[in-house]
């Protein structure tokens, strides 16, 4: 082998360094003293721009050193050296010119003595040995580099480093990181290509990069920043999904202040580059589509694809260094094959098609060729190549990452009516709302109603009714006018005639469910023809009156929840007459006042809540008003209409109706309203007494309503009593007052013997509440428990009710069907936790029974505990 391809290491200037695998040398440092090989064949080392990277070496020819050729400068070498220029003269000395020139090595003289030829042969043999040793060292270094893990700053966006990475030293445009021992030469070459392309692009654009961006005196790795952003789908996707904090943390800047600076630097330095690359990608796709259409007719013959010219645009950089090139081509070009299977390429591959990943390992640049329409460089192919376009199924979510759960809740959130809040209203003019209510214009009234509904519906804010009392007057006027319009077409009926026809709450609820199930939309053409008649105009007025009346009482209901507003409503002289008038209208025309069963049910509930909140301030003026109020309250009783034709029967039902809070939610407010009316004034009691004297059937219906909430005696009754404590207090208070209205012994006996025995069941419940250890602890541990029994008032009212019923039964000489056994009474008397006052009351009850033997004879096995 001759010496044509070798040049001694001493002939090269020391100002230029050629780092090996795993090493990096600056331009002014000392380089290793081994001979350099300039060759383009595989198995050698090519010297390019500041480093000597190992090319793709064939494993079958590791020692193929004889087929080397002299070094030829690549055109990409001049392109990749924007700020440096070298000139090697023929003798290897520094020339200092402004261009890059590599002259051929010196040829030996043709006339060499025999001694010199011998020395040259020995020197050539030594050089071959050194070259083989160098090749082995480089292979070992290459394997060591491949076994290393990728640095943390090269992972994807979704990866979070467990330990915060220390910012690297300031990189230059030629080195991506200050610590070169952690980066492969392929990464350094990729960084160089990226920075050269970026600087060239910004200079051509007219916005040159004058300074390198830094955050907290730490330079930003622009290539890594660009790769992370493009891997996430581009800057738009990063901003849309708020990936900037993750990208900043991946680059070593986790502070919140660095995020805004990072976004600013990206928009200034890399955003134009990204837009140009995307535009080039679109142009490339259109060209490929045109080629595919052109080659559709000649797919049986091999195609000759012209070679792309080398450019400095972002398109050329990504086409040469991208790792996600066309993966569907059967015979890729040699350049792409080298990039894809190079061992020095990064190991992280982006899964997104449109996001450019990290630049791959550097490859041997090819000389530029001019592409013409008449001539093209042929590609050797053993089989015909058919264009296969990249296919992707259509995303029904348009790119949004929606899973099944999010899609399921998406329809529910869209279909649900979003009510505005007080914040959405801004400044509200109450005087303008009052004028709108008094204008008699339907649109103005509707707008004012909607605003007032929003203002009064907020539970965190109380509408100050005392500061704007004109609103109450305006609402009363609107409700009065609407009620007049609805009653103008309805006949008047007698109260006693409609008492048996008055539907209960359960019947109204059933009618509402039937109406909803049978709902059907009317024909549009028929609606247009009906709107031309006079009756249709009246129907529209009636519909508007119904909606306005419902809105007014919803507003009154919301206002009545606050005590300050209750006083303002009661002090208005027109409010109570309006309420009584609506109650009478619902009693007379329960099913015909409003056309819709749902509106009828809503109006019943709103009027009951208003009456429940304000009844402690009402004084019933006469018996007629008291009768209407009582009939309206009794309509919410849990009494089962299937077992009786009318609500006022001659005989009581066989059992007390069962109360369930889920199915009878408005029985409690009805009892509360009746209790407040009884406790307000003696005049109310007098009016109720007159009603019960004239018609005892009302008294039986009221007893069924009050007795339904008293739980039956069983093992769960104590827990039920704890949950219903406020309702039980009101119910027992009303029972004690209602029993005082009873004057007939037969009626009292019927109440005591109804079902399995209401008298016995109540007495057992009172015994349980009085003697339970958790409610009345022993005296030695009394300090650990509350001193007052929470059921004390219930027990007192219950004993008063039992005493009154027992006295009425004794007056009529009527025997009870059941009575507690003597063993039960003895157990209560001997219990250490039984309350003393309750024992005295029990003793008095037993003494009043007269003959104890008679009481024992009335006991049976059914009533035993």
From Swiss-Prot:
- Per UniProt, the ranges with Pro residues bias are 356-368
Residue ranges of domain ARID in the record = 188-278
Query: Can you tell which superkingdom this protein's organism belongs to?
Result: Eukaryota
Query: Residue spans with biased composition (Polar residues)?
Result: 17-30, 328-353
The record's annotation in PROSITE patterns points to: ARID
Region: Disordered; residue ranges are 1-34, 54-92, 116-143, 163-183, 288-380
Positions where Phosphoserine occurs in the chain: 852, 855
Task: Write out the annotated subcellular location.
Answer: Nucleus
Q: Where is the composition biased (Low complexity)?
A: 121-139
By its UniProt entry, which InterPro entries does this protein fall under? ARID/SWI1_ChromRemod, ARID_dom, ARID_dom_sf, ARM-type_fold
GO CC terms: chromatin; nucleus; SWI/SNF complex
Q: How does it assemble?
A: Component of the SWI/SNF global transcription activator complex composed of at least arp9, arp42, snf5, snf22, snf30, sbf59, sol1, ssr1, ssr2, ssr3, ssr4 and tfg3.
Q: What is this protein called?
A: SWI/SNF chromatin-remodeling complex subunit sol1
Please name the source species: Schizosaccharomyces pombe (strain 972 / ATCC 24843)
Q: Which gene encodes it?
A: sol1
